[in-house]
Curated annotation (Swiss-Prot):
This is tRNA (34-2'-O)-methyltransferase regulator trm734. InterPro entries: tRNA_Anticodon_Mtase-Reg, WD40/YVTN_repeat-like_dom_sf, WD40_repeat_dom_sf, WD40_rpt. It is found in: Cytoplasm; Nucleus. WD repeats lie at residues 14-52, 142-183, 192-231, 235-275, 278-318, 326-364, 366-407, 461-502, 507-549, 650-689, 695-733, 752-797, 806-845, 854-899, 910-949. GO terms for biological process: tRNA methylation; wobble position ribose methylation. Pfam families: WD40. The lineage of its organism: Eukaryota, Fungi, Dikarya, Ascomycota, Taphrinomycotina. Belongs to the WD repeat WDR6 family. Disruption phenotype: Loss of methylation of the 2'-O-ribose of guanosine at position 34 of the tRNA anticodon loop of tRNA(Phe). Increases occurrence of 1-methylguanosine residue at position 37 in the tRNA anticodon loop of tRNA(Phe) and decreases occurrence of wybutosine at this position. Slow cell population growth. It comes from the Eukaryota. Together with methyltransferase trm7, methylates the 2'-O-ribose of nucleotides at position 34 of the tRNA anticodon loop of substrate tRNAs. Required for the correct positioning of the substrate tRNA for methylation. Also plays a role in the regulation of the retromer complex and is required for the recycling of plasma membrane proteins from endosomes.
Length: 984
């Protein structure tokens, strides 16, 4: 068998998966990110608005990279038993390996001299000379148990080591590396953790040691003359993987629970002061702290790298309402006129401004107790207030003599919505008339230095049961849009009272919180809406045809809770960033939705309390009212440079299905995290995430493209979803949008919450129409179903349903042979069967025309290739074997097809574990991949299969493989791309 030869065949070109290590080099200008064997280097210098990928280096390691250390020559890297020095400027790699697993390393005083700590609690001293490595000394600890982790620190000529065993003990020991002994006694034993330790760190002065464990705790130890446990930190809800000391007595930890937590400590306690979230799935594996800036970088199992500003905190102040006004009155309303400047209005018309200089009273509007609401126009000195008697006051808060009072409504004004575009100021006011009836006016104002001018007032005709909640204006084409409390959207011409169009259930029956115009054309508007239901939707809205339906280009559930607003900001690079804010339980949150990062949470009591929010890119303010107190929160967080995503990932859990579109430039991936992700596949093997949707409630089981614009996914809970690919230029990029859900049968007699649709096969049903698809699904209860789907009407109908046995069915693939549709089905009993489905006649029961036991246990992979009437079925099994059956199809009558076996190949123990992927390359060549992470190439020689080539994949928990022309992708926990080379 060829193991290391034929480098041009199955050559690894890319790996996308968990970020296992991070390091900063060159005065923290460059961030090194390790994924599998791939080392990616980013420029994260302050001068750059956005981090750029500078270089990608593929290391010749058999194991993935587990750790990195900045050194004089560039970067010292280790993974498993391998280690290397990488010259990041020339991409030169000097590597070697030792016999034991490496846990940590340090650079000694001299150049190209290092020490590594291994799993046997030994230290190897290494020297690099003229490109060759030498182990100059090996120092053993007196205790040599199996280790879980270790750390090392150099102080003068001393090497200090802390190592944690599988028996929950921590050993601290040291020696002089200029005169190293062969064996070293232990200085300190530390005992206290109730589970294995996963990381250890010395403080910079060497006085303290931090440890984290599977018992979910962080522990801080004093390791001076009389070692003892200082404190234990509780807060993580799952295993804690990494820790690091920060300046000013702070510690950062990351965990399986997807949180980055900051801790402060003193001589007795550890306190969790701040928690950051943003990674997806499970596990944050790595973190590193910048010494140049207050930034922490984290790398997750989802493959993303994120940066966090850990110094900018939220400042809180509390002011009694009674101290704001001269008389005994109640607070009516408040709003931000700009960030950190809050304008408060009392019932009797008194006003006060609160800013970072304190509070200041301004002249009152009126002396009657009838004021109800106040709102501001962003970035102006003008505000609008309303009374319970229907009067609107528009004025400058800097000079209340610039006042215009307008008696407009007949009763209490319940809502004011403001909108500014260039020098035009719009105000929408609403009062209650009757049940589901409102009187609404739209006014336009012009503000001069000494006067407030009312340009126009229009009473709007509202659609039935339309309660306005949001407003936006399209000045270019003189339109405005109003969102309602029940998820409807109405389009008007400026200056006209009648609405042009109304569209219902844009956000089902929940309120539209904000509307943003992304593009304005003569025939349509491209708008983004934020709904109280937690969704951000992108629509193409027609201007002309009243009956036309908005086309949904994207719909994304942002988070749990309710969304109260959103903001889009165009960046210097031409891209747009989306922020949303709202409430979850008693917390107010601001979220960077583009990067799927929570910026901050504030415990304010919930959305039912009066509140106000204002944000700029470098400052944010929130205020809430409860118990006659105003609570004001401010932070100076730079939203464009902090808490951002440097590298996007794929999935936070195992990828269970992938498929190429027919054109080969797009990929679809589905994972245990229940998300379906659209990816761009580039000609060099790079994979770029485009967008993801979540419409499954359990892990994805299978995916398939039918055409370049129609795709399907299946999962647990009997879920079958249909999607459409949107590629219109106004959508800015390719997106998948949800089109149809096949709802399970939930009758008491038949519904099974554990029932899974394990695979799907889709072909065109030309005998039923050009736009009709025939869908076959197989289920875990041994049921096979046949559906028709009309692409135009989106109608999904079940045509047939039948059972195989009682075992789980795992794969299905349709083959059209003449006028027949044959369905190849694999199951957990090791059988592969071919059914004649009689798809042209719904009344005829499907019939098994061929069945064979190909494995002792479950069939784990299935591949079918066809050459006219010859069908080749390749399988991999739970028994580690591979099988190949070559069959001849023959139609002997109009309703009858027979299958004749031409040849059967079988190789027992082909792999050491389940074979999760098989792929026919040619008639003579077959590829297989297994949980054992080996890729094998097989060749047909006579009556047998012979392995001729072996490659290793860094993908753990391999789920399968797919091919696209010259590329092969192995997927599981992440995915790895190989170039087939001459195999193609």
């Amino acid at each position: 068998m060829l193991v290391e030869g034929d480098k041009g065949v199955l050559e690894p070109v890319n790996f996308v998966g968990p970020v296992t290590s991070l390091a900063l080099i060159h005065n923290d200008k460059f961030l090194c990110c390790a994924q599998g064997p791939c080392l990616r280097i980013y420029d994260v210098s302050e001068s750059r608005h956005e981090s750029d990928l500078i270089k990608s280096i593929l290391l010749p390691f058999h194991n993935r990279i587990h750790g990195m250390l900045p050194c004089k020559q560039g970067l010292f890297v280790w993974g498993g038993t391998y280690f290397a020095v990488v010259d990041v400027e020339t991409s030169q790699v000097y590597y070697d390996r030792i016999s034991d697993w490496i846990f940590n390393a340090a650079e000694l005083g001299e150049e190209n001299k290092f020490c590594v700590v291994t799993s046997k609690n030994q230290v190897h001293l290494l020297s690099l000379s003229k490109g060759s490595w030498e182990v100059t000394n090996t120092i053993s600890c007196e205790k040599t148990p199996l280790l879980f982790c270790a750390t090392v620190q150099i102080s003068g000529n001393e090497i200090y080591i802390a190592s944690a065993s599988a028996f929950q003990q921590i050993y601290v020991w040291k020696f002089n590396y200029n005169n190293p002994p062969s064996c070293v006694s232990i200085d300190t034993y530390l005992v206290g953790h109730e589970g294995a330790c996963f990381d250890l760190k010395f403080s910079s002065d060497g006085r303290y040691l931090c440890s984290v464990s599977e018992d979910r705790t962080l522990r801080l130890w004093s390791i001076e003359s009389s070692p003892f446990l200082i404190a234990t930190g509780f807060g993580h809800s799952a295993r804690v993987w990494r820790c690091v000391f920060l300046p000013n007595k702070e510690i950062a930890t990351v965990s399986e629970d997807l949180t980055l937590r900051l801790w402060t400590w003193n001589d007795k306690t550890l306190t969790n002061t701040y928690t950051y979230t943003g990674h997806r799935g499970k596990h944050i594996w790595s973190l590193v702290v910048s010494s140049a800036n207050p930034i922490i970088y984290t790398g997750g199992n989802d493959g993303s790298v994120r940066s966090w500003d850990y110094k900018t905190r939220i400042q809180e102040s509390c002011i009694s309402v009674s101290s704001l006004f001269t008389s005994k009155t109640l607070l009516a309303s408040f709003c931000f006129v700009k960030c950190q400047k809050l304008l408060c209005l009392a019932k009797n018309g008194e006003m006060s401004i609160i800013d970072n200089k304190g509070k200041k009273a301004i002249p009152a509007l009126t002396t009657t107790s009838d004021m109800s609401i106040i709102r501001s126009w962003k970035n102006s000195f003008f505000v609008a207030a309303a009374s319970n008697k229907g009067t609107i006051y528009v004025f400058s808060y800097q000079n209340t003599n610039l006042l215009k009072a307008i008696d407009l409504h007949r009763g209490k004004i319940q809502q004011l919505l403001t909108y500014q575009v260039k020098e035009r100021y719009f105000l929408l006011s609403k009062s209650f008339v009757g049940k589901n009836q409102f009187r609404v006016y739209l006014q336009e104002f012009d503000f001069e230095a000494d006067k407030v001018n009312l340009i126009s007032t229009i009473e709007l005709e509202l659609p039935a049961t339309f309660d306005p909640t949001s407003l936006t204006v399209d000045e270019e084409y003189s339109n405005f849009l109003i969102g309602s409390r029940t998820g409807s959207l109405a389009l008007y011409n400026i200056g006209e009272s009648n609405y042009l169009s109304v569209w219902r259930r844009i956000h089902e029956f929940d309120a539209i919180s904000s509307i943003h115009i992304k593009s304005s054309k003569r025939d349509y508007l491209l708008i983004q809406t934020v709904g109280r239901d937690g969704y951000v939707n992108l629509f193409s809205i027609p201007r002309v045809e009243k009956s036309a339906v908005p086309q949904e280009l994207c719909s994304k559930k942002c988070c749990d809770g309710i969304l109260s607003g959103g903001l889009c900001k165009k960046l210097k690079n031409g891209k747009e960033n989306q922020w949303v804010w709202g409430f979850h339980a008693s917390n107010f949150f601001l979220r960077d939705e583009t990067n799927e990062t929570n910026v901050f949470f504030i415990d304010c009591g919930g959305s039912h309390r009066p509140w106000a929010f204002s944000m700029e890119m470098d400052i944010q303010s929130f205020a809430s009212y409860r118990a006659n107190q105003l609570y004001i929160y401010s932070t100076a967080l730079n939203l464009l440079q902090r808490n951002s995503v440097l590298q996007n990932g794929l999935h936070g859990r195992e990828i269970r299905a992938m498929d190429f579109n027919p054109s080969g430039d797009l990929l679809l991936s589905g994972s245990e995290d229940t998300k379906v992700t659209l990816l761009e596949f580039q000609s060099n093997g790079n994979i770029i995430p485009l967008n993801s949707v979540k419409f499954h409630n359990s892990g994805i089981q299978s995916l398939t493209w039918f055409s370049d614009d129609i795709l399907f996914s299946t999962g647990g809970l009997e879920e079958l979803n249909v999607y459409r690919l949107i590629q219109k230029p106004e959508a800015y990029l390719k997106r998948i949008v949800h089109e149809k859900l096949c709802k399970p049968n939930k009758s008491n007699k038949t519904y099974d919450g554990d029932l899974r649709i394990t695979d799907i096969s889709v072909v065109k049903a030309t005998h039923l129409g050009e736009r009709v698809l025939w869908i076959n699904t197989v289920q875990s209860d041994s049921t096979i179903k046949a559906f028709t789907y009309n692409v135009d009407t989106k109608q999904l109908n079940c045509i047939k349903s039948w059972k195989y046995k009682t075992v789980c069915l795992v794969f299905a693939e349709a083959v059209i042979f003449g006028s027949h549709l044959l369905l190849v089905v694999a199951s957990t009993d090791g059988n592969v069967a071919i059914w004649n489905t009689f798809w042209r006649d719904p009344q005829i029961e499907p019939l098994i025309i061929w069945i064979k036991t190909v494995h002792q246990f479950c069939v784990k992979s299935l591949n079918i290739s066809r050459d006219q009437d010859v069908l080749t079925i390749s399988t991999g099994g739970d028994d580690g074997a591979i099988s190949r059956s070559i069959l001849l199809l023959e139609q002997i009558s109009e309703n009858s097809v027979v299958v004749n076996s031409l040849h059967n190949y079988f190789f027992a123990e082909a792999h050491a574990s389940s074979v999760t992927g098989v792929l026919s390359i040619t008639k003579e060549l077959l590829l297989s991949v297994s949980i054992d992470q080996r890729i094998l190439l097989w060749k047909v020689e006579g009556d047998s299969l012979k392995p001729i080539l072996e490659r290793y994949t860094h993908v753990a928990d391999v789920g399968g493989m797919i091919r696209n022309n010259d590329f092969l992708i192995i997927y599981g926990i992440g995915c790895e791309v190989f170039r087939l080379g001459s195999l193609r």
